[in-house]
Amino acid sequence: MSETLSRLLIITAGTLYPAYRSYKAVRTKDTREYVKWMMYWIVFAIYSFLENLLDLVLAFWFPFYFQLKIVFIFWLLSPWTKGASILYRKWVHPTLNRHEKDIDALLESAKSESYNQLMRIGSKSLVYAKDVVAEAAVRGQQQLVNQLQRSYSANDVGSEREALTKNINIVKIEELDENSDTDLQKSPRPRRRASSRSRSRSRTIDSGADSEFTTAATIPRRSARKPIH
């Protein structure tokens, strides 16, 4: 028999049927049935704990291991064998009665220790959460500062570029002024030449006029004709 089939039979016969019978005992308020199924659940809880341990040790090599588990469950449930009642009265109840005080003390210490441990974990988690929130806030502030620095640096770069372009324009204007000054300094020479040429031309014109005046003076004037009466 496979492990899956045995597990299915154990769950069906060992839990569902006893759960329904326990419901019937509670609903009818039958004290005898109630005690009977309470003893079964105590024994079945101990069996479930031991089963998980034995499966790690016996499941791979012990012959008919899964079949024996099914037989044991039916032995506990059977009204003829009354296996759960026998185990509870012969072994479980005397053992629990002997170690009841030790078990209660162990449970109480475990309860207090678990409470203290829970409080420690809670305080540590609060401190950790506080640190995480503070670190997140610091990171957010740092990112904001970095963004502001980037924006300021971008503005500075833009202003530097504007100043640089202004300086370049000023230098170009100064160069243009210097070039115009040099052109103005070079330009009077041809003007002087032109003025000298104009002066020479005026002189020639004046000399020509003088010569014409002298020739006109030297030519004898013709006598005026007398009018004919």
Curated annotation (Swiss-Prot):
It comes from Caenorhabditis elegans. This is Uncharacterized protein T19C3.4. PANTHER family: HVA22-LIKE PROTEINS, LP05237P-RELATED. Coiled coil: none annotated. GO terms for molecular function: microtubule binding. Keywords: Membrane, Transmembrane, Transmembrane helix. The chain crosses the membrane at residues 34-54, 57-77. InterPro entries: TB2_DP1_HVA22. It holds the Pfam family TB2_DP1_HVA22. It comes from the Eukaryota.
